[in-house]
């Protein structure tokens, strides 16, 4: 809301201007109560962004408390820019995932690019050097021209920013479903490396210490971005384009280097990214955490546009900006470091004893608000919850095994589904080798980055099958955690912890809140069983377009530790003659499956079942087998079932595979039962592997590039290269065809 003349406090009240900023009548009354007076325009702007769901988690806080957040590896849990876990030898890894869904729906290139930039700043604000980027993306039906436009420009935005800033984009996931046609999801994850002694916090301690502004100038882009991210997308969505920020990755690169050098200086007290809610959130949160206040002179804020008001400066979400608190008397030393990198470093205020955020503009106090009122005293809502009618209907359904009349044609059709097909079209646009530490590039179950000058590596992944979560939020939430851990273990790593991005519809609808609550219950249970605490994350609610919500999509970003290079494992067959094992039990479970979507065009019925103790044990024995040197390749069996996992095992290798199926073929190939791995083992170790894991030997890797399935009543034989052409060509074909 950009006005030439700002409304008076009386107009704000009488014309309910606060409601256009996302505040309810009750919330406005609470602001008046906290201040002891009616707020002016700048002040109500501060409250509107800080009390948005995006900043305050006012609708999700009671739910988030269910997550386990501590563990043997956790050095920093939720509450700072990113979580941090210990990896031994005084070293640690910081990581976090965040959403940029609403901006990407309006301006896909900049929305995605600035999502990447923001998550990078969260990582280096902790003192960590960013070493890898991942993402999790959701789009609608790829036959639609608007969806193609969004998909293409989001991928370009991620690539454009990540490639220019010099951080490898090494992994992620992309899924397509009509549920996301009006509301795409763009979740960005960053991983950073740090030594224990360099860990920083966003805190404003020490009365008289200086508050310094570092980085790019402030413009009018992104004003009310946090509020925009906390409401449904309506018919007027395109008019919200000014709420989308504009990024500069080259400025970000300079900011990374400047801040990582400043962090080594003893005069630095605290540092925080000016992310959602810009100067408002960074100043209020840093002061509140320290039990202090901040006074800022807004005349000193570097501006790239003329005539900016306090309201605009405080609510701007211009990118590539950081707020520092520096010990008094050392400002010149910090400025010297920052200006060496060609950036602004300007004292704009200082820490004060009074616990207020005081903003001075042109010699007058433009706003004065208690910092706790902004940061800690935001209202928290316990929303009503109601089981949706669709869920009860699905639960009442009897499980049905689909009929497949043409097995070979159906198999190819599954491989050509955009959610299952190769994502090479996506990741070949990303520079995944910059920094030259990428050991396992996109395409395997998890990416692997080596830690230089050590034997250690990090495995990382993002995962969520939202169709399962829609069918049964509690089970689907647990499966999201379990599948992420499965991908980490299949890469030879021990899962350490996770970060989550909870993408849901409106919590104001009791059925929507029930989905959120149940999904978190399931995730929390899986986290406890698998010993993967939640160290941070993001909540993105109101993902609805014209009243239609997305599937509940709790994306899990997970990192694991590989102790030795010989433990690194990929999902690709290595040599002919290796024995192919299937770990885990296959049941007739087709609810939410690729086959169900292919045949019915929608999901229904029951989500796959999940026995968490069995999941834990299966992962444990596989990781042990990998560390014992018995495994040549390991692949999680997930979406598409064995029909996807089996050919993926040999795609790009020149090998084939010959397996025997002695159960129902449709179930064996297309069921999406959980807790399963495909594993290849040198035949010399096959007996030992079978004893250790109770795995079932189903076939061998062959020299001939042929996929052979021997069933009791038929023989299926297909050319691997032909299947690979179908799998590799699907997304490029969609993107070059006319809608």
From Swiss-Prot:
Primary site of residence: cytoplasm
Tagged with keyword Translocase: no
UniProt-annotated binding residues for Mg(2+) 1: 98, 538
Pathway field: Purine metabolism; IMP biosynthesis via de novo pathway; 5-amino-1-(5-phospho-D-ribosyl)imidazole from N(2)-formyl-N(1)-(5-phospho-D-ribosyl)glycinamide: step 1/2
One CC-aspect GO term: cytoplasm
Group of enzyme by EC: ligase
Binding-site list for ATP: 57, 96, 500, 537
Reactions the enzyme catalyzes: N(2)-formyl-N(1)-(5-phospho-beta-D-ribosyl)glycinamide + L-glutamine + ATP + H2O = 2-formamido-N(1)-(5-O-phospho-beta-D-ribosyl)acetamidine + L-glutamate + ADP + phosphate + H(+)
Disulfide bonds, paired cysteine numbers: none
Keyword Transferase listed: no
Keywords for this protein: ATP-binding, Cytoplasm, Ligase, Magnesium, Metal-binding, Nucleotide-binding, Purine biosynthesis
Residues forming the catalytic site: 54, 100
Endpoints of the signal sequence: none
InterPro entries: PRibForGlyAmidine_synth_PurL, PurL_linker, PurM-like_C_dom, PurM-like_C_sf, PurM-like_N, PurM-like_N_sf
Gene3D superfamilies membership: PurM-like C-terminal domain (3.90.650.10), PurM-like, N-terminal domain (3.30.1330.10)
Location(s) in or outside the cell: Cytoplasm
Assembly: Monomer. Part of the FGAM synthase complex composed of 1 PurL, 1 PurQ and 2 PurS subunits.
Role noted for this protein: Part of the phosphoribosylformylglycinamidine synthase complex involved in the purines biosynthetic pathway. Catalyzes the ATP-dependent conversion of formylglycinamide ribonucleotide (FGAR) and glutamine to yield formylglycinamidine ribonucleotide (FGAM) and glutamate. The FGAM synthase complex is composed of three subunits. PurQ produces an ammonia molecule by converting glutamine to glutamate. PurL transfers the ammonia molecule to FGAR to form FGAM in an ATP-dependent manner.
Similarity annotation: Belongs to the FGAMS family.
HAMAP family given in the database record: PurL_2 (MF_00420)
This protein's name: Phosphoribosylformylglycinamidine synthase subunit PurL
Origin species: Exiguobacterium sp. (strain ATCC BAA-1283 / AT1b)
Name of the encoding gene: purL
């Amino acid at each position: 809301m950009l006005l030439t003349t700002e409304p008076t406090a009386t107009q704000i009240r009488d014309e309910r201007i606060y409601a256009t900023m996302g505040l309810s009548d009750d919330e406005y009354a609470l602001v008046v109560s906290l201040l002891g007076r009616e707020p002016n325009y700048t002040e109500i702007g501060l409250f509107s962004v800080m009390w948005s769901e995006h900043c305050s988690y006012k609708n999700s806080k009671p739910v988030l408390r269910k997550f386990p957040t501590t563990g043997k590896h956790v050095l920093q849990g939720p509450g700072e820019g990113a979580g941090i876990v210990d990896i031994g030898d005084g070293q640690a890894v910081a990581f976090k995932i965040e959403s940029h869904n609403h901006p990407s729906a309006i301006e896909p290139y900049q929305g995605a690019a600035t999502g990447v930039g923001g998550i990078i700043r969260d990582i280096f604000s902790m003192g960590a050097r960013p070493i890898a980027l991942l993402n999790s993306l959701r789009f609608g039906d790829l036959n639609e021209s608007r969806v193609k436009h969004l998909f293409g420009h989001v991928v370009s935005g991620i690539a454009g920013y990540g490639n220019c800033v010099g951080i490898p984009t090494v992994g992620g996931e992309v899924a397509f479903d009509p549920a996301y046609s009006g509301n795409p999801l763009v979740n960005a994850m960053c991983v950073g490396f740090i030594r224990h002694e360099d860990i920083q916090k966003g805190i404003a301690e020490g009365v008289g210490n200086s508050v310094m502004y570092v980085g790019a100038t402030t413009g009018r882009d992104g004003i009310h971005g946090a509020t925009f991210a906390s409401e449904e997308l309506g018919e007027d969505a395109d008019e919200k384009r000014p709420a989308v920020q504009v990024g500069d990755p080259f400025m970000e690169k300079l900011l990374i280097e400047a801040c990582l050098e400043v962090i080594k200086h003893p005069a630095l007290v605290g540092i925080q990214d000016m992310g959602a809610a810009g100067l408002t959130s960074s100043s209020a949160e840093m002061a509140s955490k320290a039990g202090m206040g901040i006074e800022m002179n807004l005349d000193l804020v570097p501006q790239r546009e003329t005539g900016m008001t306090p309201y605009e400066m405080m609510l701007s979400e211009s990118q590539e900006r950081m707020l520092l608190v520096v010990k008094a008397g050392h400002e010149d030393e910090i400025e010297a470091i920052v200006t060496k990198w060609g950036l602004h470093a300007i004292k704009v205020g200082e820490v004060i004893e009074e616990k207020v955020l005081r903003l001075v503009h042109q010699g007058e106090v433009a706003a004065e608000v208690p910092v706790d009122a902004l940061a800690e005293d935001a209202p928290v809502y316990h929303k009503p919850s109601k089981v949706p009618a669709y869920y009860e209907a699905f639960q009442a359904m009897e499980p049905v095994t689909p009929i497949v009349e043409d097995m070979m044609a159906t198999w190819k059709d599954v491989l050509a589904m955009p959610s299952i097909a190769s994502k090479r079209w996506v990741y070949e646009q990303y520079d995944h080798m910059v920094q030259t530490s990428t050991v396992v590039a996109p395409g395997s179950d998890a990416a692997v980055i080596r830690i230089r000058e050590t034997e250690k590596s990090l495995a990382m992944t993002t995962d969520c099958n939202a169709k399962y979560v829609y069918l049964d939020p509690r089970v689907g939430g647990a499966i999201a955690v379990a599948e992420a851990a499965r991908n980490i273990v299949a890469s030879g790593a021990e899962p350490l912890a996770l970060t989550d991005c909870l993408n849901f519809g409106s919590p104001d609808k009791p059925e929507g809140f029930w989905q959120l609550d149940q999904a978190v219950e399931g995730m929390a249970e899986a986290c406890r069983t698998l010993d993967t605490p939640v160290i941070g994350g993001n909540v993105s609610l109101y993902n609805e377009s014209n009243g239609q919500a997305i599937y509940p999509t709790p994306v899990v970003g997970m990192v694991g530790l590989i102790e030795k290079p010989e433990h690194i494992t990929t999902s690709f067959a290595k040599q002919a003659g290796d024995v192919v094992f299937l770990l885990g039990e296959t049941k007739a479970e087709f609810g939410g499956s690729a086959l169900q979507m292919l045949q019915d065009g929608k999901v229904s019925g029951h989500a796959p079942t999940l026995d968490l103790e069995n999941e834990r044990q299966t992962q444990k024995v596989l990781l042990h087998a990998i560390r014992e040197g018995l495994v040549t390749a390991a692949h999680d069996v997930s979406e598409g079932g064995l029909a996807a996992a089996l050919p993926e095992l040999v795609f790009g290798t020149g090998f084939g595979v010959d397996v025997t199926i002695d159960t129902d073929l449709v179930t064996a190939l297309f069921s999406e039962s959980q807790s399963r791995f495909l594993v290849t083992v040198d035949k010399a170790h096959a007996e030992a592997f079978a004893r250790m894991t109770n795995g079932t030997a189903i076939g061998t890797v062959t020299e001939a590039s042929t996929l052979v399935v021997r069933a009791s009543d038929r023989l299926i034989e297909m050319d691997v290269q032909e299947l690979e052409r179908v799998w590799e060509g699907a997304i490029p074909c969609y993107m070059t065809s006319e809608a």
